[in-house]
Amino acid sequence: LVNDVADIAVHSLKDVPALIDPQFSIAATLPREDYGDALLLREGLTIDDLSKNLKIATSGPRRKSQLLSMNSKLNIVPIRGNIQTRINKINTDNLDGLIVAKAALNRLKIVHPNMYLFSEDQMLPAAAQGAIGIEINTVELESQLGNLLKLLNDESTYQATQIERMVVASLEGNCLSPISALCKIDAQNAELQVRVSSQDGSKVYNEEVKFNLDNKIDALESFIETLIKNGAKEIIQQ
């Protein structure tokens, strides 16, 4: 898009910075997949073993901090590669477990024999997790592609992910910040949960709000003000 060699970019929306160049915009989102995080465990282990000093791989500070808040003695190690490569590393790298997005497993039709799906209370997802976003050059292509992309757009997913990303941007966070945000929309009613953590998981702050979408701007401004007043920015920097 930047070099003008493509008209449309399709992203895993959770990996797109919350603040993007005003020249571009997320013009549409596809219906959201499962937004949860999955723990793939070595054979013989169960979720109850998470209370032990297990070696768990994850590439994200958000997941790491929430894991450490459950058990500070866990050995959290970074991991890279595509999904299948990561799964193979459970054996090749002597891992006890690996955390991946459930949406990634679903899209690739991967079924792991020893999987645990975290509840929202245990691990709140990243903003826009499970959503596919379509980005365009707004200035040049809105008039040409706007109506077409509206046909692809899932409005509830679009609204929810925009709200989640707005929270991350307001906290000056990015893809690597230990910030979780999940918005659920039912008709015109929205429920937003936010969790921020320190890098080591020793501090966790949760906040939630319910509002009508007609009052979205005022409700979010007040909610974000509460987050900041209660030290959310400071916590994610620790």
For each predicted feature, which ranges?
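Paired acidic/hydrophobic, glycine-rich loop segments that form the ligand-binding mouth/hinge
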Residues: 2, 7-12, 96-101
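Short glycine/serine/threonine-biased micro-segments
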Residues: 2, 7, 58, 128-131, ...
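Mixed-charge, polar/low-complexity N-terminal
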Residues: 6-7, 20, 36-38, 80, ...
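A conserved helix-loop-strand patch within extracytoplasmic ligand-binding domains
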Residues: 13-73, 140
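Small-molecule-sensing regulatory modules
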Residues: 69-238
